[in-house]
Amino acid sequence: MRTNEREIPYNYTSADDDQVITHLFGPGMLKTLENLRTKRVTGRSARLLFRFMGDMFIIERNPFIFQDFVDHPVKKRNFFKSIEKDLGIIEAGARENRVFQVIERCREYLDTLARRINTISSEQKRITKALDTIIGRENIYFDPFTLTAHATDATDWRLYPPLAVVRPSKESQMAPLVAAIKELGLTIIPRGGGTGLTGGSVPLTRTSVMINTEKLNTIRGIKQFKTESGEAFSGIELEAGVITDHAMAAAREKKLIFATDPTSAWASTIGGNLAENAGGKTAVRFGTAIDNVLSYTIVMPHGEERFVYRKDHSLTRISPNETLVFQVKDAGGRIVETIRLKGDQIRKPGLGKDVTNKTLNGLPGIQKEGCDGIITSATFILHPEYNLKKTFCLEFFGNDMTEAGRVITEISTAFENPGDEAALIALEHFDEEYIKAIDYKTKAAGHGKLKAVLLIDMVADTEDTLDLGESLLGAILAGFEKTELIAAKSSKEAERFWRDRKRLGAIAKRTNAFKLNEDIVLPIASLADFFDYVDRYNTEEKRYNQNMLISSITAYLDTAEPLEDPQWLVSKTERAREMAAREQKKIALASRESLEEETHAQDFYKGVLELLRGYTLVTETIKEIYTRTSSRLIVIATHMHAGDGNIHVNIPVLSNDREMMKKAGKTADDIMAKAVELNGVVSGEHGIGVTKFRHLSKKKVEAFNSYRTRVDPLGIMNPGKLSDIDVIDRVYTPSFNLLGLEAGILKYTSLESLAATIANCVRCGRCKAVCPVFYPGKNLFFHPRNKNLGIGSLIEALLYVTQRTHSTRFKILHHLEEIADHCTICHKCHTQCPVNIDSGEVSVMAR
């Protein structure tokens, strides 16, 4: 590990120098440079070499900068001349063979980049020529804005932008489109709403064409069907790009329930829901996507269309002992395969959700995360609405989650098999970290500190049944003194209760919108043990952070240089060390409550400031250390679909702090290990993607690889996904937690306010549904989520241009004008945003 992890300039990402070097040149180059480190004399060659790497990294990752070189040949020629001059200077000063090898590798990379820039226009023409007759030129995108918006999903992890984005407008176009892309020798990534939480649609190669299904958004209607036994039921036929909320609304109009309702229903799409086997708050009653799908169409990697139909649908949540039969037909209607699946193959026995069995006996599409084809349409069963619904809010008070865990377990068990009795179609929990993040207003008088909240929707067909359900709930809670029950008195009040649940994205605001967002599933009986584990983990992280706070301040005092009276500071420093030792001993033995209040760390901090009163420079630095160290506290925040044990674990993290990122990564690994220890699984909704692949069992990986090789031997679909165990170490995220020169540039160019305003965007897509300039039928995709990604990339480009050329003549700003002009300033997005971004104001600032 180098002493200075950030010698490569223009790197406004989470990647440290080791990661950048490995990304560009492979691990061999990193080893060579480590060996050459001790050979530096003046360091000039190293600075030029690292600047070269900074140039290459940002040109590769930023479509606006890359396109700028394509559009301006003279600028490109001058730039490459200056790079060659720098490499020549390094070469002239070289004294050993390894340096010449490094220069040769750099020139090879430079030649490759030059070829890419010189040939990209002809490559785009080749792609357009092949696809134009299938989907139309207007549905083929190479512009930097679109490529940037498709470089990541809700995770913000990324590696490469896509080569192109295509948006078919008819389902019939999909099969020939896939076949044509295959003939071009390119790979394919399916994408719907971009709401994925594991990086499933993040491009991992330079040659991926992303097929966006958002224009396939027709709701074909609600129809009547019959099971093989003659039982009538309703179903809804949908194209893959239909937004989940729209499907739910269409069902609601007919007093029916569309049960596949992930939290991201405002932006997620039907195809993605099936590819992930998504569930949501009603999964406790009706199951996930696989429980509710009747049939679907999928285009396989070679362009063949397949129709998959579930025979004799049970119209209920799949039981562990049930056997499902799916028939797979080709485009001519011929049955080519019959797949049988047992309930315990879909979900591990004892669990409410489980998406870790990727193979599912070879069932196409479902749970495959876009690795075996593209789902183009589907029919889902619909459930009759209950006549009555009542919403309850449970508030848990106290210093730990012990009682909350027991209450949730007892409620879930009591209402497990409702039959004709009152049923719970939603049990949604969030903990104290979310309570703080969303500024939750306590509804009950309480018994002290609010520890967690549980929202419940209880349904029934008669008043008597609903009353009995409420009585049962009250009886369960009678033995729990720290739990308060509040019933919503009206539908409007119920809506207000649930509004808090929709604002949980605010958890990442403290760390500029980046967090590790994982989900696990546990047996209901293990919930109390897990809550206790999280409580203890968070307590120990507070202990660690407060120790680090004191250690960092005392370490600074050993090197502090005051403007006056340095000899007096020496004696005061010795006194500060004594205070530090005393308070650190107390921290080692401190209770949860004491650590929560930061009692001993605060005593030390205030004591040191008082001790050094008058040493303004020193005390101001101590305040900065306090703020910086406190912000590095690792916190596990949890919310969950309580009825099926599906827990969502969020760890907010500062993406520019590599050590914090590593610590957060270890925390996520610890959570996964604990889930397995408690007989759970590492995902019930989010999928595996790039973030969880290393936690998938070897047996499941081998089974999926075997299936994938059979259906996609050329590796056309979603390359790198669910196959590269080290990919999580290669992806990175942008980071505008900038200091020094970059912050000064932002201020000088009037971009500081713009950058600060969009910095908290969590890419949830809630803005999309209400945005007038999101209109797929008219090729308008300028909703705030996409715009914020584009603006962030443009700010990065402007920082680079300013630092690299020492100029503020920004030709690249015309892209910002285009983004800003696509806004009606209606402010509808503002009311939807969980982190309170007013994108109307963003557009005004951009203009």
Feature roles, as predicted:
Residues 82-100, 419-515, 543-589, 784-787, ...:
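Terminal amphipathic helices with adjacent charged low-complexity linkers/tails
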Residues 662, 737-758, 774-847:
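Ferredoxin-type iron-sulfur electron-transfer modules in oxidoreductases and energy-metabolism complexes
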Residues 218-228, 234-409, 413, 716-718, ...:
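FAD-binding subdomain of flavoenzyme oxidoreductases
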Residues 66, 128, 137-144, 258-263, ...:
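Flexible, glycine/charged-enriched surface loops at secondary-structure junctions
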Residues 85, 89-119, 177, 246, ...:
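Flexible inter-domain linker/hinge segments
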Residues 127, 131, 180-181, 407-412, ...:
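Short amphipathic alpha-helices in soluble, non-transmembrane regions
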Residues 507-511, 516, 545, 572, ...:
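Activity-critical C-terminal alpha-helical subdomain
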Residues 1-179, 197-234, 263, 381-382, ...:
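N-terminal flexible segment immediately upstream of the FAD-binding catalytic core
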